[in-house]
Amino acid sequence: MGRTLAEKVWDDHVVRRAEGEPDLLFIDLHLLHEVTSPQAFDGLRQAGRPVRRLDLTIATEDHNTPTLDIDKPIADPVSRAQLETLRKNCADFGVRLHPLGDVEQGVVHVVGPQLGLTQPGTTVVCGDSHTSTHGAFGALAFGIGTSQVEHVLATQTLPLARPKTMAITVEGELPDEVTAKDLILAIIARIGTGGGQGYILEYRGSAIEKLSMEARMTICNMSIEAGARAGMIAPDATTFDYLEGRDHAPRGEDWDAAVAYWKTLRSDDDAVFDAEVVIDAAELAPFVTWGTNPGQGAPLSANVPDPASYEDASERFAAEKALEYMGLTAGQALRDINVDTVFVGSCTNGRIEDLRNAAAVLDGRKVADGVRMLIVPGSVRVALQAVAEGLDKVFTEAGAEWRHAGCSMCLGMNPDQLAPGERSASTSNRNFEGRQGKGGRTHLVSPQVAAATAVLGHLASPADLSDTRTPAGVR
């Protein structure tokens, strides 16, 4: 019987298999940041162990870093301590680190791919749930806990139970206004935030194959929001073109050999998935969330749902609590929801294509009065590219704030936060209560919807703008 993509990569990395025990997998790339690594290094220090594979380990600073005045001391003592601890640990153990101010610094899941460290057929781990991002390359990538971080640092392996596999097939053409962010939000709304629990998701079909690499990263990034262990997309010419020439990509004969292997990383025709979901791309539309989890979303053209319409009691209760927290009324048009802040950035939508798409909507327009808009590139490299293309000027001339690279408003762990009751349209990945700051209210959107929302001051798509200019950009 044939094997799925996930099964092929998994099998290639098993270094020990015993009946009744989890498989022991070799890990090809271990990414670190300041939040989940301190206790792991402490464990190594107490046991007198070194980092086993320094060549497969890399760290960056992202979660707690400020996006303004980065040359000044960090005010928050906890954030400052975590960054100082990471720097000391990396120096003590010899781990490569890209700190705040370094040209390669940025959000960990942006840095790995742009350096060519993330490659098809590899295993990638990080103490961060959105490690699934790297699955866009056909890598098996997943977030791990701090004790597992220590285990990988010490052994370069990880004992894991083999997940099931789910195929999510998206066929057809995405409508002009529909982006990868809209697609993944629609998928999560369809299968639910627990629909992928225990599975590795494989996104496939003609609509997926037509996506750029950065759009594919957006899709895989949010796999965890459906409860999945990981998300993957089979590598193809788009993948190879993205990787070729990057800092850590193979070269010469090694490149040819790598591509030959990468081309085998597809699910066999006779592979059997444990579950399958099929989606018609033509039926999709710009999508936004209205509630307090990524599965509580709807097309922008819809109204806030009535909790009474849910047959399941737990879903009905969750909807009631979400509307109460979000300050919304059942039946209210989503387009009538005003926002205070718009955030473009994060490991979901902080790459150069995302900034290009937002800039294409903002070009020649102004952010609405009373709306604060933050544009935060996912890495210093992304920022430099945006400046080279003049995107920063488009943003600032529109009235948006152009910031330094970092996780920023994706999570309330740095100075970029919502105030209680403040409402945002955000290109990030989570809309939990307090995710962007205590009492903050978050609507997840695409970069294009974020930009249009900033201009009009309420949830909107580029089609809602008063002129007929068609925004350029890459889906």
Swiss-Prot record:
Pathway assignment reads: Amino-acid biosynthesis; L-leucine biosynthesis; L-leucine from 3-methyl-2-oxobutanoate: step 2/4
- The answer to keyword Amino-acid biosynthesis applying to this record is yes
EC number in record: 4.2.1.33
The cofactor(s) it depends on are: [4Fe-4S] cluster
Q: Is the keyword Mitochondrion in the record? A: no
Ranges for the region named Disordered are 418-442
Mind listing the UniProt keywords for this protein, alphabetically?
A: 4Fe-4S, Amino-acid biosynthesis, Branched-chain amino acid biosynthesis, Iron, Iron-sulfur, Leucine biosynthesis, Lyase, Metal-binding
Q: What catalytic reaction does the record list?
A: (2R,3S)-3-isopropylmalate = (2S)-2-isopropylmalate
Q: Name one GO biological process term.
A: L-leucine biosynthetic process
Please indicate which superkingdom the organism of origin belongs to.
Answer: Bacteria
Q: Which residues bind [4Fe-4S] cluster?
A: C347, C407, C410
Cofactor-binding details, from the entry: Binds 1 [4Fe-4S] cluster per subunit.
What GO molecular function annotation could you give as one example from this UniProt entry? metal ion binding
Fetch the CDD domains from UniProt: IPMI
User: Can you state the subunit structure given in the record?
Assistant: Heterodimer of LeuC and LeuD.
Function according to Swiss-Prot or TrEMBL: Catalyzes the isomerization between 2-isopropylmalate and 3-isopropylmalate, via the formation of 2-isopropylmaleate.
Q: Which NCBIfam families match?
A: leuC, PRK05478.1, PRK12466.1
Family that this chain belongs to: Belongs to the aconitase/IPM isomerase family. LeuC type 1 subfamily.
Q: What is this protein called?
A: 3-isopropylmalate dehydratase large subunit
Originating organism = Streptomyces griseus subsp. griseus (strain JCM 4626 / CBS 651.72 / NBRC 13350 / KCC S-0626 / ISP 5235)
